[in-house]
């Protein structure tokens, strides 16, 4: 999917943006309004920023590609690229047709809402009306972390969204400053990537074309 942020004023959705470079992203407010799983009015009239991920279900990608194949259009490569391209469309009607979804992950400035842990934040986001990924687990030790990784590595093919790993976070927010940050990322979170899927393909032919500058380019 594509990282996104949603801003609410008095409980009303008023700004949506992509993560961009971490400081400045694209304003995609109009397009995010087309995402049914993103609440437009919260259950509480608060000012809040919530970060998450906009994604396309694998079943939706298959459905869209079947339609595009019948219409003689190029197929969408994968759910991740399809979600990013769909969210950035200039025409929000096209975005709506792509049937995007959103998972909420992060409550910005949780102390303002008396939320003290990651698990409590996810529960709070659900009460506000957000779509929270049900596949999150509270682990008590490293053995449970390893068990969870192995479980979802074996289950990921059955999920209706593409995933290449798991994010592991310290649960207690008051430990974050103590644990600290590197120049680019926090030390209290780490992304574990599943082993890459390996497939075998047959190369039937190579066609050489000459580019504008005279460079010879091989095409499989």
Predicted features along the sequence, with ranges:
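RNA/tRNA-interacting regions in translation and RNA-turnover enzymes
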Residues: 1-220
